[in-house]
Amino acid sequence: MRSASTEQPSSERPVRRTPPTGVARTTPLTALSRVPWADIQDSTGSAAAIPLLLNGIAWGDAETARSALEDLRKRICQYGFVVEQATAATVPFLWELAQLPHVSCRPQIIQLLKAIADARQWECTAAAYPKLLNRRENPVVWERAARQAVRARRGDLGRLMAEQDTEIARATSELARALSD
């Protein structure tokens, strides 16, 4: 005759051996810790909050992701055309998020990448005021680095253009046009 177990039921979650459906097999944003966020600047000062915002986009519900992306946009591409020191470091993570099926605001991420690719505010200002180029913190260099970071991943455009979601495909087509210049 068997006796009933005297062990208490566990309140711990079981260890999940496979990722949830629709989630990439590799964890997104694993390289975030390699960037010295506290040592670089966004529009608010220290860029230390950027990893939290990127994680909010990656793992938050639709409203959380949308809010995090809007806050991130204000920090790295203020007004839709003024890039910051942290912008170039953030771009590879935006490309990564734009390709993850579970991320709810992918078209808006692609639109942000296009805004960064189009950014020429600091270059235009420096053309009129060359002294801007003599500053220790040179925003023209940031702007060029950010545009180059977007261009560096243009090989990912084909995969995004093949998406069934028409909003993603349209945003990707606009980004592709911006990168073809």
Question: How would you name each of these model-derived features?
Answer:
Residues A47-G56, A88-L97, A152-R159:
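Alpha-helical solenoid scaffolds in eukaryotic proteins
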Residues R2-A65:
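N-terminal "cap/leader" segments of large eukaryotic alpha-helical scaffolds
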Residues L132-A146, R151-D181:
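Eukaryote-biased recognition of C-terminal alpha-helical segments
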Residues A38-S43, Y79-T87, R120-A128, P139-R147:
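Flexible loop/turn segments at the boundaries of HEAT repeats in alpha-solenoid HEAT proteins
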Residues I57-D61, A98-H102, M161-A162:
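Alpha-solenoid helical repeat architecture
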Residues A68-L72, I109, L113, E143, ...:
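Conserved hydrophobic register position within alpha-solenoid helical repeats
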